[in-house]
């Protein structure tokens, strides 16, 4: 994100974006509507009913891992390269993309992260309390 403006969004949120003029580090999940510039590319799924924030975040990690280290400012990460990249997805017993697994996995990571953050805040408060009382 480059900042906040009062202009109306040009692109719908709930999608993965990347820049076709930089490295693979500029791959992001955009949860809300945004203003897209000419070099911001979007990844659009063939079937969209099963994609949500958690499944996109799971795919994002796979997509970034697949692209990582292959590009720099001389070797651009273009839309044509992105279209040809093969990303290995989790599949269920029917050999279909396992959206339920991706949803559950990312949901669990979010819950663990929140629990760790709460524990960190508690420890930090206790450290402040001890420092103030000494």
Kindly give the residue locations of the regions a language model identified.
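DNA target-recognition domains and sequence-specific DNA-contacting regions of bacterial/archaeal
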Residues: 1-86
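Amphipathic alpha-helical coiled-coil/heptad-repeat segments
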Residues: 85-134
